[in-house]
Amino acid sequence: MSKETFPHLEALRDLMRSKHIDAVIIPGTDPHQSEYPSEHWKFRDYVSGFTGSNGTAVVTLDDAGLWTDSRYFLQAAEQLEGSGFTLRKENIPGEPTVLEWLGEVLDEDAVVGVDGRLFSLIEANRIELFCAQNGFMFAPDFRAAEAIWTDRPARPMNPAFVHDEALAGEDVDSKISRVVDALDAADADGLLITALDEIAWLLNLRGSDVDYTPVVIAFAYVSEDERVLFIDSEKVTFEVKDHLKKYGVKIKDYDDIEKFLGKISSTATVMVDPNRVSDALGQAMICNKTYMASPVIALKGVKNECQIAGFRQAMLYDGAAMVRMMMWLEQNVANGITEMDVDRRLQQERAAYASNRGDSFHMIAGYKDHGAIVHYEATDESAYTLAPEGLLLIDTGGQYLEGTTDITRTISLGNPTAAEKHDYTLILKGHLALARAVFPKGTMGVQLDVLARGPLWNEGMTYLHGTGHGVGHFLGCHEGPQSIRMEANPTPLELGMVTSNEPGIYKTGEYGIRTENLLLCVPACSNEEWGEFYKFESLTLFPYDTTLMDMDMLSREEVKQINDYHAMVCERLRPLLSADEAQWLEQKCKSI
């Protein structure tokens, strides 16, 4: 047990013994159910050493497991070595879930502890019900991080800033009015908002408290008569204070949220999103509660014309930055550059634009077999040195004041094999099929998912991640309410939604291939008999790798689609490029 996190595991067990806790469940999130929590809340990482964005650690007095999905199997296997944790694979036949495993290993009357601040009401209720059914005790206030994490990073105190209404396309009064309309329709008096991206969108605020997502850590409460933001005072600049005052938003201390909720009249009804509000906050409320999805999610998911224009501008910046990075990569691939150098170079190119605010997630630059690790994150220690051969998968995104980007390209660094070209073309065919889809109003993502997977399925292959996720406007790179995946999601695709299109194939020990563009849902046609039909507009601006295409596998329709896309990329990016850069791009986009 040589790994440095192992002493942390033993310290946790010592605390468990002293508190008579037999098992503890540790998620990888924060009190806001954030995809990317601040360092202050990464207790799971501290105990286990696993750093993936999805994963749950479970510790008993004599065993420990880390549950994660297929995106992180290879990463987790490496990071958990010597940690005292066993990798447990989610959604794999024969593998027990967290609760199934606890049911097998715990004795009757065992006590299962959680930090109720980190579990949504639905999750906590599920664990509590499981405990009751199995004769276990449920302890929802086991706060281990405060007790054993001696060098815990402080809660971030970065200043918030106002997101310009000219970029947001709607002022705070208008947004809150629409939320209040949703409350009236649900016979609710108020709405508790805990998700950071919802608060940022609703109040036109942004921040830098969380890596990759420009949000500020806060809570909010909204009703017809009251607007309250719970935030650390250190984050409130004069500009932010004036902005909130203009829209009648009161400011209270971040830590006063439970006290405030406890004072809401017992006759009032507050709308609570059980998938986002924590168990700790839910238990603090004595008022009536109506459980339903926050109306902010749906409102935020449909972009207005200003936001769409911003997305298009961000794609121009990002496409030009990609061109410059790729030119540099081609010129230096034989000079000993690494996966990390690719990451740094693209950050440098993006930063040349004044509105850039960093990346929208940690770049995945996976060379050769590293590309088969779906959410691989290179470090200076793990990074491969590139050479003029093999495949390089680059999945990256930028944050700009105008919008958020997310793009994946797989490129050949030289001499692609027949197998690489075959697999690349299969992925491209699925990607193209989804991009050219026309579908009736009311269609859900699950109904379109097969378009992207079909070419792989025809050859007995698949991928285990989703095909598409929503993307925020200068917010989270991954958001809802829509998705395109095999699992059912009742949310239909609506006009103005921005969704990713990213099929992939991963061959362990060999390579990974993924191709991703962002798609905007736009009108296609309508008629009296059949109603409205929608289609997609590809927002992302960067060419596919034509050297990896097996032309015998492409139809005339697909060839035309590729050529039309490449012509658009050239036309739109050319004004941002130098003569040499434009010439490079035109070569990459020449007709096939």
Residue ranges and their predicted role:
Residues 1-592:
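Active-site neighborhoods and metal-handling regions in enzymes and metal-associated proteins
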